[in-house]
Amino acid sequence: MGKLIDIPIVVESGQKYKTSQGVTAIKDGIKSSGQDHERLPKPKWLRIVNHTTPAYSQVKEQVQKHRLATVCEEAKCPNISECWSHGTATIMLMGAVCTRACRFCSVDTGNPHGWLDAEEPENTAETVALMNLDYVVLTSVNRDDLPDGGANHYAKTIRAIKKRSPRTKVEALTPDFQGSERDVAVLLDSGVDVFAQNVETVERLTHPVRDNRAGYQQTLNVLAFAKKYRPDVLTKTSLMLGLGETDEEIIRTMDDLRTHHVDILTLGQYLQPTKNHLPIARYVTPETFSELRQIGLKKGFFEVASGPLVRSSYRADRVFKRDNLGLDV
């Protein structure tokens, strides 16, 4: 009798499957609709350049060794090769299954039923130390199944990083914790340097773009509370463009963000991750991104990173240092 060979099961986008923890999840977050919307042709100026360097391999090795999830992989970020080749990565905490199903996001969705990796805070801190990072971005899936939304897990991870690598700056791109100021305060007391939460889109499009449990005003309120509670911590948010918003709505959103004391803004082009996700309504030109950056700076943002391939944590270390000026993003 021949030797049995394990054949990996390929899960199609939109299909249900079970994770290694036994959690039922939907691949890429959105169920298959059976429809394939006509896609806008990609403009010539929107090109992703792949970088492969020894640093890329080192980051990948550390991520795999410590069983870390990264938003770079899970959200199919177009900048993964560039960022990893520069020795930086955005680490995704609390697993790779989100309790929400935003219609722009390709992270798998499901209910982890309270599962957490107790070793993750120390593993993450060890990885950051081994990579000798000056700046690290932590993000996570939404964990509405946890009483605190994962705030204490975040705080443990940040404290572990600061203990091993006291000079490392830590940015936390967090879920909204259902608007709980108590949970947000737990995270802010951990020693975090930048508190980020994404408003994602303009107010009019919030319902069709984001999960129903998210809210435009709720995100603004959380960001405002963070600044009031810890004025020394920079606050940050991100907008995707190309979902059907107008330039006037973008500028109005900037005004709302400044009213709620948000320091840093990133603007990037929405790219449809699978056929099951929201279609692209328009491609915003590099010239428009540049104009919007200047408008944002005039409104008083500490920094505005704006470009077709800009994502929430793209070049976050440079943005933190206000070293984004003149970059071709």
From Swiss-Prot:
CDD domains: Radical_SAM. It catalyses: [[Fe-S] cluster scaffold protein carrying a second [4Fe-4S](2+) cluster] + N(6)-octanoyl-L-lysyl-[protein] + 2 oxidized [2Fe-2S]-[ferredoxin] + 2 S-adenosyl-L-methionine + 4 H(+) = [[Fe-S] cluster scaffold protein] + N(6)-[(R)-dihydrolipoyl]-L-lysyl-[protein] + 4 Fe(3+) + 2 hydrogen sulfide + 2 5'-deoxyadenosine + 2 L-methionine + 2 reduced [2Fe-2S]-[ferredoxin]. GO terms for molecular function: 4 iron, 4 sulfur cluster binding; lipoate synthase activity; metal ion binding. It is found in: Cytoplasm. Binds 2 [4Fe-4S] clusters per subunit. One cluster is coordinated with 3 cysteines and an exchangeable S-adenosyl-L-methionine. Keywords: 4Fe-4S, Cytoplasm, Iron, Iron-sulfur, Metal-binding, S-adenosyl-L-methionine, Transferase. Its EC number is 2.8.1.8. The keyword Cell membrane does not apply. InterPro entries: Aldolase_TIM, Elp3/MiaA/NifB-like_rSAM, Lipoyl_synth, rSAM. This is Lipoyl synthase. It comes from Legionella pneumophila (strain Corby). The gene is lipA.
